Amino acid sequence: MQISVNEFLTPRHIDVQVVSPTRAKITLEPLERGFGHTLGNALRRILLSSMPGCAVVEAEIDGVLHEYSAIEGVQEDVIEILLNLKGLAIKLHGRDEVTLTLSKKGSGVVTAADIQLDHDVEIVNPDHVIANLASNGVLNMKLTVARGRGYEPADSRQSDEDESRSIGRLQLDSSFSPVRRIAYVVENARVEQRTNLDKLVIDLETNGTLDPEEAIRRAATILQQQLAAFVDLKGDSEPVVIEQEDEIDPILLRPVDDLELTVRSANCLKAENIYYIGDLIQRTEVELLKTPNLGKKSLTEIKDVLASRGLSLGMRLDNWPPASLKKDDKATA
């Protein structure tokens, strides 16, 4: 079948070579020239930075106040223990955060299998070494495991509440991604007479909490969802103008009675239909002096009260009165 030069090829052959339970090689071909790197790089970035997973985010070790401590009877120092905790491959079924405990004493190796698990928590690598104990060694820990995405440094989870947390709760930089290694190569491919096509080979290894094939599938789904917005992209022939009322300072909506003026001044203002502070500040001194029974003494009082609130006479409000201010409100003000 002859293929038009203007027609884009889509991959017809997908091969999955399972190297181990945690590693696979996925081959995708044929691809138009350049699309191997385009898709390979996009999938690689998503696999490394956007895949959800679980990791230890906090550890509390008996007798340890900070990460630069050493524990009697334990071969590793605290920093080494924390590094080993980062290697745990954990799955949470249902919850987003759990607290687990580990208690071990006496000579021997402390592994992930020594962690006491809840019914909805699974450790994929139970043989993972956490520490080595001497005959007098004792290791008691509380581990907080959380669900997340990508890489999250310890200080990004700290808040004002963390300042009051008990000393000895050690925060860990956490890599939630189940992907341990991802690499891709682009090789030459051929379809009929076209020899300048691409073949994408992805070599992917996970920590065992997620199957490599499923990881690729999820990464492709994320990419597809992000690009979906561009598929239906269309510009409006005429921009839609949404009329939005400018925000008004709440103090302007308060009645003039809140200014606590003298009875004489307040009655003079109401006689001129000045019910709200927003009504008042738009009047000038000349206008107010024309008000019956309102003299210079009352005017000075009004100016001083407005100044104490950062206001003055003669101000202009383009959006006054607001639509939310009903006429009935003035009658009851």
Curated annotation (Swiss-Prot):
GO cellular component, one term: DNA-directed RNA polymerase complex
Known partners and oligomeric status: Homodimer. The RNAP catalytic core consists of 2 alpha, 1 beta, 1 beta' and 1 omega subunit. When a sigma factor is associated with the core the holoenzyme is formed, which can initiate transcription.
EC number in record: 2.7.7.6
One GO BP annotation of this record: DNA-templated transcription
Broadest EC class assigned to this enzyme: transferase
Domain notes: The N-terminal domain is essential for RNAP assembly and basal transcription, whereas the C-terminal domain is involved in interaction with transcriptional regulators and with upstream promoter elements.
Family the UniProt entry places it in: Belongs to the RNA polymerase alpha chain family.
Keyword annotations of the record: DNA-directed RNA polymerase, Nucleotidyltransferase, Transcription, Transferase
Gene Ontology MF terms in the entry: DNA binding; DNA-directed RNA polymerase activity; protein dimerization activity
Function: DNA-dependent RNA polymerase catalyzes the transcription of DNA into RNA using the four ribonucleoside triphosphates as substrates.
Renumbered residue ranges of the record's region Alpha N-terminal domain (alpha-NTD): 1-234
Superkingdom assignment: Bacteria
Catalytic reaction annotation: RNA(n) + a ribonucleoside 5'-triphosphate = RNA(n+1) + diphosphate
A Pfam family assignment: RNA_pol_A_CTD
Region of interest called Alpha C-terminal domain (alpha-CTD), as start-end residue ranges on this chain: 248-333
Name under which the protein is recorded: DNA-directed RNA polymerase subunit alpha
